[in-house]
């Protein structure tokens, strides 16, 4: 039975008010019919290519390169188009130009002896690549992607045949005129950016843009201007959202992590957070303290620091860590329902003897200098610490760039996403030992599974946006911190975060953080099916896509789990994890032919990519191959278009039976 035969006079009358509104956009039978034809045509195009990335952790150079080369897709297309008609070095040069047009043009112009001839050859090559990557889209969609100043010319070049002699001459005249009017550079840049844009139709970031890397703010700048993307918040993203909401414990954690890895760029250069008060306080308070255990991990730092600066960062690191423990204890005292009393650890120190007393056992402390801690009241901030935190608070709350990036995270982000039979979330859905969903108490009500993630999503938004209910906002702000380190938080899901123990106790038995049952049970297909069903994801080819836990490829661990139902794609974008993973990240690519996992080798640098044509070496694995090419009609977008077509067909009937008059 067709959609047309489902349309009855009763259904049209029931939808009449909506159809009258729709008639404003399509005021005639001809207009509605044309739109139906257009939408039906779109349904039968191949689905756009989706790219999934996770756990970028501030590694902006590698992230931007993967976007520019579309995880190796641009290089593959250049090889397909030009085959043996170009030498390998020429194909490499063309790819580098597509990735970094402005920078590569400068190098070319400094060395090329006949620049006009180079322009002529290169523009023809770019037109061929552009024709290839745009072939799966409607002309309308391509047109919307074009820069306004070159829109008409690019359309002419893309849609004219070069086989007919007359058309070939026509195209050559256009290209020659671009060169003679000295617009070749701008045109090449526009074409390269268009190729990048059309090669990735949609981008999914499955959490953790932020953390230890040097340029989370640069990644956010890129995303805020990106044509089509979404974000599933990771634990580090939530921590920054908590800081931007005004939670001072989250602010302290953010600063501590930056100090630990010697990456101050995001805080200072990106968001203008004034760290001078912290530096002054740390120098005064820890002037005679070597702070040895707080020395930053400089092999991951964003700059090379001299000895004096390293000493200062070390002191600042210790100062903010102690403040963090105090601020967190205040939340724990305020919220006994969080059940985290066992994480108040300063009170377990015997300050006179320099030992940590835990469960009847004594452990020597690696650092025994606590000038700001009163043993009688260990969690009270000193007057100087209180003043410092107020200044840090002011700095976070008045950063315009941070506000812009947080709005972007809220607008395009969420705790999870269901898209084209895939369920995306960063870390976990808390489970009991038997695989049932763990019930989590929030404000006296129990939540689990999908409802739990929905409730948490709402609380995070309340923490940032709510101006009306002060008590609700205060709870939500505290709960954001719980999401960072609370045992029942889907974004954390461990028994504890052993920050204190890792700093102060040498005995590694106290460093252990036990993961929730999800991480053991997620390898079972029936568990993944249960989670997918909970989120309403049904069908033959359904998947859960996760990040959060690095896949130790170097030890033989596989990203595919539970018979292919679960894909864990944290492969180590973060340089800190690359020794563990043995690679430098994954991209999951979902196109009309199926699912592919692209495994990346470490990226050297943008400079080497531009000057030497160094690309990321990537290995592609086919996870799922579609025997029949997947079309737009098979996607979520296709379902929306089918609904729109049905509404337009109702409008046509309403016009034809006179319920709505045409506006000719």
Curated annotation (Swiss-Prot):
Stored InterPro entries: FBPtase_class3, Metallo-depent_PP-like
Pfam families: FBPase_2 (PF06874)
Cysteines paired by S-S bonds: none
Catalytic function, reaction form: beta-D-fructose 1,6-bisphosphate + H2O = beta-D-fructose 6-phosphate + phosphate
GO molecular function terms listed in the Swiss-Prot or TrEMBL record: fructose 1,6-bisphosphate 1-phosphatase activity
GO terms under biological process: gluconeogenesis
Species per Swiss-Prot/TrEMBL record: Bacteroides fragilis (strain ATCC 25285 / DSM 2151 / CCUG 4856 / JCM 11019 / LMG 10263 / NCTC 9343 / Onslow / VPI 2553 / EN-2)
Protein name, per record: Fructose-1,6-bisphosphatase class 3
Record EC number: 3.1.3.11
Pathway: Carbohydrate biosynthesis; gluconeogenesis
Family indicated by similarity: Belongs to the FBPase class 3 family.
Gene name linked to the record: fbp
Cofactor(s) the record lists: Mn(2+)
Keywords per UniProt: Carbohydrate metabolism, Hydrolase, Manganese
């Amino acid at each position: 039975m067709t959609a047309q035969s489902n349309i009855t006079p009763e259904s049209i009358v029931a939808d009449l008010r909506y159809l009258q509104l729709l008639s404003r956009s399509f005021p005639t039978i001809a207009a509605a019919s044309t739109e139906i034809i257009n939408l039906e045509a779109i349904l039968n195009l191949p689905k756009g290519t989706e790219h999934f990335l996770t756990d970028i952790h501030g590694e902006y150079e590698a992230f931007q390169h993967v976007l520019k080369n579309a995880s190796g897709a641009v290089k593959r297309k250049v090889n397909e188009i030009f085959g043996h008609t170009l030498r390998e070095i020429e194909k490499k040069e063309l790819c580098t130009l597509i990735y970094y047009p402005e920078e590569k043009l400068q190098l070319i112009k400094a060395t090329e002896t006949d620049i006009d001839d180079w322009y002529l050859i290169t523009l023809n090559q770019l037109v061929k690549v552009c024709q290839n990557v745009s072939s799966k889209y409607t002309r309308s969609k391509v047109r919307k992607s074009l820069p306004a100043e070159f829109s008409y010319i690019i359309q002419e070049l893309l849609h004219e045949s070069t086989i007919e002699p007359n058309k070939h001459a026509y195209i050559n005249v256009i290209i020659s005129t671009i060169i003679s009017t000295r617009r070749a550079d701008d045109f090449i840049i526009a074409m390269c950016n268009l190729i990048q844009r059309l090669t990735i139709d949609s981008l999914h970031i499955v959490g953790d843009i932020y953390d230890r890397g040097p340029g989370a703010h640069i990644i956010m700048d890129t995303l805020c201007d990106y044509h089509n993307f979404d974000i599933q918040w990771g634990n580090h993203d939530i921590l920054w959202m908590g800081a931007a909401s005004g939670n001072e414990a989250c602010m302290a954690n953010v600063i501590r992590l930056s100090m630990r890895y010697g990456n101050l760029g995001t805080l200072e250069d990106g968001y203008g957070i004034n760290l001078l008060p912290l530096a002054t306080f740390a120098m005064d308070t820890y002037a005679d303290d070597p702070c040895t255990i707080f020395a930053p991990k400089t092999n991951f730092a964003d700059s090379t620091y001299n000895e004096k600066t390293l000493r200062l960062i070390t002191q600042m690191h210790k100062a903010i860590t102690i403040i963090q423990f105090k601020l967190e204890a205040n939340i724990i005292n305020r919220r006994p329902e969080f059940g985290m009393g066992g994480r108040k650890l300063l009170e377990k120190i015997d300050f006179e003897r320099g030992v940590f007393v835990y469960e009847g056992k004594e452990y020597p402390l690696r650092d025994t200098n606590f000038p700001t801690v009163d043993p009688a009241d260990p969690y009270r901030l000193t007057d100087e610490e209180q003043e410092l935190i107020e200044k840090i608070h002011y700095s976070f709350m008045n950063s315009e760039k941070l506000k812009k990036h947080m709005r972007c995270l809220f607008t395009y982000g969420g705790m999870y996403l269901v898209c084209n039979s895939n369920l995306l979330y960063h870390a976990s859905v808390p489970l009991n030992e038997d695989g049932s969903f763990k019930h989590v108490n929030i404000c006296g009500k129990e939540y689990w599974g999908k409802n739990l993630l929905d409730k948490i999503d709402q609380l995070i938004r309340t923490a940032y946006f709510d101006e009306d209910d002060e008590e609700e906002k205060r709870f939500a702000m505290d709960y954001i911190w719980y999401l960072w380190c609370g045992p029942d938080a889907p974004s954390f899901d461990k028994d504890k975060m052993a920050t204190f123990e890792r700093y102060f106790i040498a005995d590694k038995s106290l460093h252990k953080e036990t993961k929730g049952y999800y991480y053991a049970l997620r390898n079972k297909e029936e568990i993944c099916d249960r989670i997918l069903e909970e989120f309403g994801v049904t069908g033959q080819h359904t998947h859960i896509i996760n990040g959060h836990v690095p896949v130790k490829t170097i030890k033989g661990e596989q990203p595919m789990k539970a018979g292919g139902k679960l894909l864990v794609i944290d492969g180590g974008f973060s340089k800190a994890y690359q020794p563990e993973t043995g690679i430098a990240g994954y991209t999951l690519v979902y196109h009309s032919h199926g699912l592919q996992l692209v495994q990346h080798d470490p990226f050297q640098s943008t400079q080497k990519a531009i000057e030497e044509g160094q690309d990321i070496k990537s290995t592609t694995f086919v996870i799922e191959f579609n025997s029949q090419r997947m079309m737009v009609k098979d996607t979520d977008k296709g379902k929306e278009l089918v609904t729109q077509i049905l509404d337009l067909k109702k409008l046509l009937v309403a016009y034809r039976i006179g319920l709505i008059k045409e506006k000719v």
